[in-house]
Structures are given as C-alpha cells and as structure tokens.
Design a protein with these regions (language model features):
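Generic N-terminal targeting/processing segments that precede catalytic cores or assembly contacts
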Residues: 1-360
Length: 360
C-alpha cells in the first residue's frame, strides 16, 4: 500500500481501524524543536470520535504517544514515530462486509487489488480512523509554522446544501461546530440529525485559509503548491474535490473579472482581490492561501442499498451495521488543516534549501 508521503518530509502512516494501534513516522523534522504535547492533544481532540450525537458513537481517547524521535519533548533528528492505541473496536459488525461490499466505500476495490487479504474490520487501512495519525503529523507542522508567523484555520462552508457564505475567520476553528454564522450552523446540524434518523448521511464543504505565508513557496508544473496541498487533502477519505481561490466559479468569469490586480499596501505588493487563492504558477504570492475541499456523504448507512455477493456473484441488498458518522464534515475540519500544514511546512523546508544553495 502507498501510505507514505515523499517530500522534504517523509511521512508514513501505519495501522488499521481495528488494529491494536495506528500511528505515523515522520522523517526530516529539524532537530531541537519542542513539541507541545498538550496542544497536540487538543488538536487531535477536535477530530476524535464519540463527542456528540452528530458523529459516530465509537469513543476513542486518541492520546498520542511519542515512541521515538524526541527526547524530553524535543526532536532529536531521528525519525519521529507516534502512535494512538485503538481501545473501542467491534470487528464483528463487519463480518457481512467480507462478502457484500458497501456501495461508495473501498470494500470492492480493495478486494480486487488485494485479493481478500485486506483487513475489512472498520474499513481497515481505508478507514477515516487513519486521519488521526495524519493529524499528529499536521499538528506538529502547525506548531512549527506558528513559530514562522504562519497560521492555518478551516471552517465548514456547507453541509447538505446549506451554505454559510460569511468570510472565514481564525476564531472559527475553536468552535465545537466550526461555522462563522451560528444560526446557519444550527440548520446544518439539524440536517445531519435528520439524515441520521433516516439511516442516511450527508456531505459538505470545508474551507481552509493559510495566512502569513511568504511569497515564493512552491514550484511550477508538478511541484506547485496546489499540487502539494491537493495531494495531501486527497489522503483524507471522502474528499472528492479540491478548488483554490475562485475555483470552478472562475470558469464563468471574464479575465478582467478573475485577474487579481496588483497594488501597494504598507509598502508591500499585494492583490486587490484573491481569486487565485494566493497561488500563481504553482508559487505563493504572499496573499492568503484559500482552498475548499468537498466531502461526499458517509457511505456506511443503515438505509438499505443494492450490492452484490462476491461469493455467489449475484445481486443482493445491504444495510450497513456498526457505528458510523452521519456526516464526516465537522470532524474533517482539523484534518484539512493538518494536510495544509504538512504541505506548507514541507514547501518551507524546500525554500530554505534553495536559499542555502544560493548563499553557498
């Protein structure tokens, strides 16, 4: 399985949803950086399951344990490995799914690729549970970026077609339900609960903003900042689309509307608008990076669906048992922040290599 991100950082995620533990190994972190474990724990708690009736009832503490790579809370230059123990699993809920794949889930494609050797319980390595170690890596990168004056925050833009059109604000990330407009957030929550009552699920959109990012990060072509961010965001299960700045809306604009006019602001070159989302030619221009990720509805639902029996090779119906989120979007907000943090910090490390080479 390809579960390693190769950049200036090498990030390898391991484990399965119902394995004894899940975790991550990060190679390439600078030595001498202190990791605030309390802050990291708070970040992971935003993603943790079992917090309220809007998410899965599976309860996991999600307390990260540093196995190696740090001494007294300070990175030592060796690869850093951290893990989270799985303590609340019910693998018997997935016995049926070994023969009848869930529509919309990776059960069928995993069966084709791995020939039945894959772990089905809880979705195995394909589970959203694996975003917890992604958040460990991203949470560490968030701390390191903050030292550079770079902040990353995300919020819910829409759920079930209900949209919060207000501009994103940094304070939103700390809310239990991270929306700008609380009244619209209440409507979103009611839509989630209505889908849950019907044995169904809903999807939505998360917007992420990166502020304080210097101009000049990223590369043209294959190493662009859009490429890097999108690659990591698509590591989050259920993400089906990513757009930057005006995104697909730019396709309906004229060039005179979409182009961001350059201007001077406090002695610095800025743009009057930000339709490009802070990136031009794959390289940051100093404006906030703005992107949105679209999440499909959770495929595991109690509502009866059509599927097939793999052993009998005939059509059948399936009602998915177990504990699942009626909407993954609220818990996905810190995951999007984590993915963005890894991409930006990785690009920052690369930029420093260029600067060192230029000086030498």
């Amino acid at each position: 399985m390809s579960s390693t991100y190769h950049g200036n950082l090498s990030i390898s995620i391991f484990g399965q949803s119902h394995a004894p533990a899940i975790g991550v190994t990060i190679d390439g972190l600078p030595a001498g950086e202190r990791i605030d474990m309390e802050e990291l724990g708070h970040f992971l708690a935003r993603r943790a399951p079992g917090q309220n009736r809007l998410c899965t009832p599976r309860k996991e503490a999600d307390v990260p344990e540093i196995v190696c790579g740090a001494v007294d809370g300070v990175t030592c230059g060796a690869p850093l490995t951290a893990m989270i123990r799985n303590t609340n699993t019910r693998s018997q809920d997935y016995d049926t799914l070994r023969d009848v794949p869930r529509p919309g889930h990776a059960d069928y494609t995993a069966q084709i690729k791995y020939g039945g050797a894959q772990d089905v319980s809880g979705g195995g390595h394909f589970s959203g549970r694996l975003t917890a170690p992604l958040c460990i890596a991203g949470g560490i990168c968030l701390q390191l970026l903050r030292q550079e004056g770079i902040e990353i925050f995300a919020r819910i833009v829409s759920i079930a077609g209900i949209t919060d059109g207000a501009p994103c604000a940094a304070a939103v990330s700390g809310k239990p339900f991270p929306v700008v407009t609380d009244e619209i957030g209440e409507q979103m929550q009611q839509a989630i609960l209505a889908a849950k009552a019907d044995g169904d699920s809903v999807g939505g959109v998360v917007e992420c903003v990166v502020t304080g990012c210097p101009a000049g990060l990223g590369e043209p072509m294959f190493g662009g900042m859009e490429n890097r961010i999108a690659q990591l965001v698509f590591a989050i299960p259920a993400v089906k689309g990513v757009e930057f700045g005006a995104g697909f809306a730019a396709a309906a604009m004229r060039g005179s509307e979409n182009n961001d006019a350059f201007c001077m602001e406090n002695g610095e070159i800025r743009t009057a608008t930000n339709n490009c989302g802070g990136i031009l030619g794959g390289i940051t221009n100093g404006m906030p990076i703005v992107f949105r990720a679209a999440f499909k509805p959770t495929p595991s639902i109690r509502r009866e669906q059509r599927s097939v029996s793999l052993s009998r090779m005939e059509e059948c119906t399936l009602s998915v048992p177990g504990r699942h989120d009626p909407c993954i979007v609220p818990r996905a907000v810190p995951c999007v922040e984590a993915a963005a943090a890894i991409a930006v910090y990785d690009a920052l490390l690369e930029a420093r290599k260029y600067q060192k080479t230029a000086r030498d």
